[in-house]
Each structure stands twice: as C-alpha cells, then as structure tokens.
C-alpha cells in the first residue's frame, strides 16, 4: 500500500516579515525626506526668483526716473513759459537734490536721513511733462514744467509723491499734491548716499570725492547756494512675501550702516545701485 505524499508550502517567517517591514519603512522614509527636500528647494528657488525679479524691476525703474535729476532745457519747444525759465532753470540745476527750507511754501519738504537704521527719504528737482504720480498739475498735456518727486518708505511700501515745483516756489496759486503712488511693496528699508564733487587741485572734474548722508548735505552747499551732488547710491532691503521659512544666518548690510541679521525667518535681499546725474555733472564741470 502506497503512502500519501503531501505538498508542503513554506511562507515568511516572523523574522523575515519584520525585516521586510523595516526595510519598507526605511525606504518610504527616505523617499519622503527626498520629496520634502525637493519641495523646500523648489519653494526657495521660486521665492528667490520672485525677490530677484522685484529687485531688478525697482532698480531699473528708479534708474530711469532719477537719471534725469537736475535736467532743465530752457530751449525746449514744449517748455511752459508762463514763468521766467532762466531763473527756474538755474534753480533746478543748482538744487538737484531738495533740502529742507528750499521751498518757502513747504519748508519741511526735503531729503532726510532716517534716525538710526530707519529709512531715508529722497526729494529731487527736474523738468518733465508729469510727476511720478502721472499728474501734470493742470498744465497742458505734453507741456514741460518744474517737477519735484519725493521718494519715501510708507511702512513696507516704497512710494513716490509728486509736487508742482512752481507752486512750491510761490509762482502758482494751485498745484499742491498729497497723492502718492506705490512703486514696490515688501520693501523693509530704503537708504540713500549722495555723491559730492569738489575740486581736486583747483580743477573740477565732476568725479565723486565723497559719499555722504542727507544730514551732511547742508555743509557742502556752495557760497552761491548750489549743491554739487553729481550722483546717488540707493539700497533697498526687500523681503519675499511667499510663505517660506528660512533660518537667517546670513548677515546683510545697508549703505552707511553696520551688518545685521534679519530678526524673522523670511527671505531678504539687499539691492543696490549707483545713479549718476548726467545733467548735474555737466553743470559742475562746465561751470553752468
């Protein structure tokens, strides 16, 4: 009589099963870590791209606006001639940067140095068809006139307020403007240094001989009342507004101030530029 032969089946032992589960958890954990790392890197790169775009935009916009500081062409066919254009031209060329008390109707209007590390403000004179807000202050469309633009930081928004220079000089009955436009948000500091040109060995070259803050400008006003500012340095501290947390260990530095580390975990970058006032440089070197 033949005996029965059974088919025996073997499975995972408990030890093998535990090893498999452990390896699976390790692989899954590694994949999650890689995913999180890639996700953080992608978020960081996106935030960095946005802040770089904001920085390039505002630098380009300010350079385009401020390059013409001190410009006045009394021979322009579009210049409004309801005032003495020779006197107006001399005023703008001698005062490219506005200081406090330059305008009797608004004596507090002027470029200011912020206390401590607080933001600065910049006020300039030029000839244009409108102010930085787009207003032409009831001049005919396309007419050029004395424009005063004031750049300042309102909390974390860089703004510009336009003024009618002829009104400020008492030559018009109206023209005051309290309106301002936002140039860029998420700006946490705005610093300005002014390039002063003084003669070297008795020769005026138009080169910057010193960079100073706004509170020292008065000391460099010439005997004839002119201010030899031929350029400016601008610095802006911009923060990205994306929801990103970064441990800040990188020190930053603004113009004329000590290094600092941001107090929160946002992404910050400092953007700087130098702008030469070509028209003022010509006035200084040519002697008017």
Q: What would you call each of these model-derived segments?
A:
Residues 233-236, 272-274:
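Active-site scaffold segments
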